Amino acid sequence: MNHETSLALAANEGEERKHEHWPMMSFTFPSRLYTIADTLGRPELSFLDLTQKICAGGARLLQLRVKELPTREFLPIAHEVRAICRQTGCVLIINDRADIALAVDAEGVHVGQEDLPLEAARKVLGPDKLVGVSTHDPAQALAAERGGADYIGFGPLFGTSTKATGYNARGLDQLREIRALVRPPIVAIGGITTERAPAALAAGADAVAMISDVVLASDVTAKVREVLEKVKEA
């Protein structure tokens, strides 16, 4: 589906939605910085080391993204990350794995377009946990809202080398379009740096997800503090 077709479908759905009753969203991001613990590119750091450094910088929202480990190795890591997050008051979201999120009592799960469907993730976690959904165009964002997503991820906003999404950079204009169409909070992701974060927030994102700029920093804790100050001013 090209951008023009997607936008037209989204606009039609948006018009139809005006006549429906939509509940007020109940979730808000605890921070404008959405950190992601992914050790790709930092083989010398364990997930626990990285989590400790991120949380020490004052992060209040962290997604644990573990792609390369089998479940029996992932689970104990998730338990330990959960303990660090509880000690520091950081909300923990597990990437992709609703079963792991349930097992460690994380606050929620984040799923992509090729992962466990939103409805299935909700059945696994129940109504009291968060389910976030990655989207890449207006139609996907509206589908996530209709499905009851607590928040919507949108991107890649800019070019990114961290994760191969199969989608071209979406840009700030399309972020503005998404913001005008949906009510749930939006986290922008993809190529976002400390310098680009304010522009993403000004375009309608409620939070910005950062991986490379944080994880690859020589001092991860100091970088988190720097970004938190930057987004506070935006």
Predicted regions and their residues:
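Glycine/threonine-rich flexible loop motifs
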Residues: 163-164
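Short, electropositive alpha-helical surface patch
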Residues: 205-213
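Glycine-rich adenosine-cofactor-binding loop
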Residues: 171, 188-193
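Conserved N-terminal beta1-alpha1 strand-loop-helix module at the mouth
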Residues: 20-115, 123-150, 167, 177, ...
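Leucine-biased recognition of intrinsically disordered, low-complexity hydrophobic segments
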Residues: 7-9
